[in-house]
């Protein structure tokens, strides 16, 4: 690959190109008691990041479900690349939520077509198994469009999975609670028991099993 000079250093063209891209990472479902934790990675150019910001891309928690679903195809269309990773309820129970969340992020990063020079991660969770450059940004989904876009991709995708699982796990109100420990959900556990997709490590701490 042809070498070019960047800030007095020789770097290959692909590395310089990757530095011009913003790669945001975010997770969803970390605090749920049912189902996997999802992470998304979204790669944006500065121009397309600005366009998405103008379209209303921000922290997924600040958007309605309808707005998130409307923005998803726009994010996919304008991103240079995007990917998803997840860790199952079983992995969460075996590894702990911190490590399982980190694993889901790394799985998302590894699915990207090219190795990123640097990733920007929402929150304080550093990726111990990722040896490349990374930045942790508190409230990053409100500050970086790529992280905000990743939060929307992860949220819409996980919510869709929860809605599909409602048919198989009826009686737990998964369609409504999306796997989170609402009062209705926790009461249903006493009536219906624990499924193989419930996070038993979480339920143990809540004295539910």
Swiss-Prot record:
One Gene Ontology molecular-function label: manganese ion binding
Cofactor needs: Mn(2+); Mg(2+)
Subcellular location: Cytoplasm
Residues bound to a divalent metal cation: 26-27, 122
One Pfam family it belongs to: RNase_HII
Broad EC category: hydrolase
Catalytic activity field: Endonucleolytic cleavage to 5'-phosphomonoester
PANTHER family, A to Z: RIBONUCLEASE H2 SUBUNIT A (PTHR10954), RIBONUCLEASE HII (PTHR10954:SF18)
Function: Endonuclease that specifically degrades the RNA of RNA-DNA hybrids.
UniProt protein name: Ribonuclease HII
Chain's gene name: rnhB
